[in-house]
UniProtKB/Swiss-Prot annotation:
Pathway: Carbohydrate degradation; 2-deoxy-D-ribose 1-phosphate degradation; D-glyceraldehyde 3-phosphate and acetaldehyde from 2-deoxy-alpha-D-ribose 1-phosphate: step 2/2. It comes from Lactococcus lactis subsp. cremoris (strain MG1363). GO terms for biological process: 2-deoxyribose 1-phosphate catabolic process; carbohydrate catabolic process; deoxyribonucleotide catabolic process. It is an enzyme of class 4 (lyase). This is Deoxyribose-phosphate aldolase. GO terms for cellular component: cytoplasm. CDD domains: DeoC.
Length: 220
């Protein structure tokens, strides 16, 4: 198992300085992680820094609340791609999901999916705020719209990835769609548990600790 290729090496804290973003980029190069996941303001910089590597640039859209309008999310995604993003992690309209307004949840994802081109779209459903029934429905919609991944969490809500949720998401979307476990993975043991549950990508700030067999208490 090349666990490094499961890892989106992540820094999304509002107060992360350029030096911390550079550290994440340098570590991603060293360990050949799948991507760096950074806020949109850093996308162009990271794209330039990583242009001679295999590391992808991932960013977040409608983050972390998912409460922007669909039009704004689509603009954010288009702008990020123009700046060099390879992968887009968008937050669903969580309030719409809790209201059972599934048409809005669907159109919201579809509007972003329509501008992704050949880039990857991951759909964050924020599992800690949804019932199992709502998680299943959100995953079904993301798959039907044409997203590439479903993702558990932003890392900024009431909880992160749980094995139960990853299993449920994998069962819902089947074997061919990506599932990203994000938030709360601190070491190799926890990373392996998520992969065993069906995760094909891990959103972590503990990428180095996972590679070194250590435990990290870092958050996003």
């Amino acid at each position: 198992m090349q666990i490094n290729k499961y890892i989106d090496h992540t820094i999304l804290k509002a107060d992360a300085p350029k030096s911390k973003v550079q550290q994440i980029i340098d570590e991603a190069k060293k360990y050949d992680f799948m991507s760096v996941c950074i806020n949109p303001t850093w996308v162009n910089y990271a794209s330039q820094e990583l242009k001679d590597s295999d590391v992808k640039v991932c960013t977040v859209i409608g983050f972390p609340l998912g409460a922007n309008t669909s039009e704004l999310k689509a603009f954010e995604a288009k702008n990020a791609i123009e700046n060099g993003a390879d992968e887009i992690d968008m937050v669903i309209n969580i309030g719409a999901a809790k209201s059972k307004d599934w048409d809005l949840v669907e159109s919201d994802i579809a509007d972003v999916n329509a501008v992704k081109g050949d880039k990857l779209l991951k759909v964050i459903i924020e599992t800690s705020l949804l019932t199992d029934e709502e998680k299943i429905k959100a995953c079904q919609i993301a798959k039907a719209v044409g997203a590439d991944f479903v993702k558990t969490s932003t890392g900024f809500s009431t909880g992160g990835a749980a094995v139960h949720d990853v299993k449920l998401m994998r069962q819902t979307v089947g074997p061919d769609m990506g599932v990203k476990a994000s938030g709360g993975v601190h070491n190799l043991e926890e990373a392996k548990a998520m992969i065993d549950a069906g995760a094909t990508r891990l959103g972590v700030s503990a990428g180095v600790a996972i590679m070194e067999g250590l435990t990290s208490n870092d958050s996003y």
